[in-house]
Amino acid sequence: MSNSSLALKQSGLRWLWLALLVFIADITIKLIVMDNMGYGWANRIEVLPFFNLLYVHNYGAAFSFLSDQEGWQRWLFTGIAFVVTGMLAYWMRRLPASDKWNNIAYALIIGGAVGNVFDRIVHGFVVDYLDFYWGTYHWPAFNLADSTICIGAAMIILDGFRAKKSAPSQS
């Protein structure tokens, strides 16, 4: 066995199974929503006094950013997702597998990004289905991929506040 394959097995890339799990769960849920729910507000399913299931198309990014454009944003967001996924995979390759916090954060972001890219390429839009609200205010609809991207990003931010182990001094 070569040193490079051993190093690869010890790298954070071992956590890519989590990205694959997120991707599969995200796409499966979206297919179930598309096959079993009517489109739009009139077909929402009221689950709790603050939560609906709702099948909608998002042609933009988070919070429908740029959704009113003519379609170029689909490719912009797809390109951004590919760049971010490549960058995070590179960082995972450089991290030891034992750095669970960061590897999990990166894998969650990768899985969510790839799930939304799949939608953009295959459907031309992202399927959203989670609708949380308070009174008459509705948070923009979102999906599992959006959630894992946000959780991963929050983990990265929180990691910035965690105490780092200092390297032993070389005296």
UniProtKB/Swiss-Prot annotation:
Primary location class: membrane
Ranges annotated as spanning the membrane: 15-35, 47-67, 72-92, 107-127, 141-161
A single GO BP: proteolysis
Enzyme class (EC, first level): hydrolase
Catalysed reaction, written as an equation: Release of signal peptides from bacterial membrane prolipoproteins. Hydrolyzes -Xaa-Yaa-Zaa-|-(S,diacylglyceryl)Cys-, in which Xaa is hydrophobic (preferably Leu), and Yaa (Ala or Ser) and Zaa (Gly or Ala) have small, neutral side chains
Coiled coil, from the record: none
Catalytic machinery residues: 128, 146
Listed EC numbers: 3.4.23.36
Domain of life: Bacteria
Location of this chain's protein in the cell: Cell inner membrane
Family of the protein in this entry: Belongs to the peptidase A8 family.
Name of the protein described by the UniProt record: Lipoprotein signal peptidase
Organism field: Vibrio cholerae serotype O1 (strain ATCC 39315 / El Tor Inaba N16961)
Lineage of source species: Bacteria, Pseudomonadati, Pseudomonadota, Gammaproteobacteria, Vibrionales
